[in-house]
């Protein structure tokens, strides 16, 4: 199985597979303020602020998963210190959860609106197909500009940023430093599961 998510600069493939994806057409919702989502994990809590005006379909998709309870009990299954932490698709034991149809990649419009893959931002994980993101996401623990949109090609489409950590970055960094190992075909899996215990909308500030 191909790993969902970005690859570090030292592990980028020379060629990527191009495939058509079914697009999930999320209806943008008008927000008086940017929504905030609190994650409680077994290693501490953190909060994300989301930007529906800059990545509307991506935010609508993420909130639908969050509000349905989909992320509760999932794990951060791929952790690379000095790069990013990735979660939202597997339960303990690397049991993959069934997701809805993938969504359109908004990396280009998000970049034009000022959202970049930099320290503390959250973006959608995907396969080599640019339009394959569904539920998995990652949080950058350093500036990763090479993940930003460059051109409309499989190699250049980038990863859509849709929010940033506004509370608990110390928790995110602590997760990024957890020891990892290879579990079957999955690399960079925390040896001690990092469990997302709950995800909830919180009042915007």
Locations of the language-model features?
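Bacterial N-terminal signal peptides that target proteins for export
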Residues: 3-19
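Cyclophilin-like peptidyl-prolyl cis-trans isomerases
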Residues: 12, 24-205
